[in-house]
Amino acid sequence: ALHDLVNYDTGLYYVRFTPFSFFEFTFRETLLKTQHSVKKTWNYYQQDRSSTIRVRPLAEREGKWWPSVVIGVNDIYSAYGASFYAGYYGVATKHFQLGDGQIALTAGYFRSIKSGKMYNGAFGGVEYCPLQRVPLRIMADYDTKGVNIGVGYTLFRHIRTFAFTHRLKGWGVGLSYRTTIKF
């Protein structure tokens, strides 16, 4: 079933810019094989370009009870198109030591700007790092529509790899490179 491995429905690429520890901007493009338009680009029929702006008004402090709080908005402007990610959200995350590892609990709420789009409602997740010196992450979350489970591993401090199930029906893999540009 090599055909099944390469006959995927979507693709995604993104660029994330974090000029300050409390501010982040992301541009993403999702490629879909749905036939909503006539022009076919890169073997896809539809592209959804979107951006995200996130601010963190409250940072988590080690040894204190309060979580990190982030508020954000996705795809705030769209002249036309799908706007799959359009909405705003608030999220809180708290990390706890668990033996030699660490666990992070996240809860939030996403409000879709356009009804019937990608996400709408409460979401949450858990991430477990069994050993702090080993860059392995085991994750599970609920994304307002279903449960996702995944693993991630960081190579050479910059290359992140991951594999996950999508609502326990399909699967995905990914690769990203993270670096800090010094000025």
Summary of predicted features, one role per range:
Residues 160, 166, 170-183:
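Flexible, glycine-rich linker and terminal segments associated
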Residues 1-80, 84, 95-98, 110, ...:
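Transmembrane beta-barrel domains of Gram-negative outer membranes and organellar outer membranes
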Residues 3-7, 81, 85-157, 181-183:
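Outer-membrane beta-barrel transmembrane domain signature
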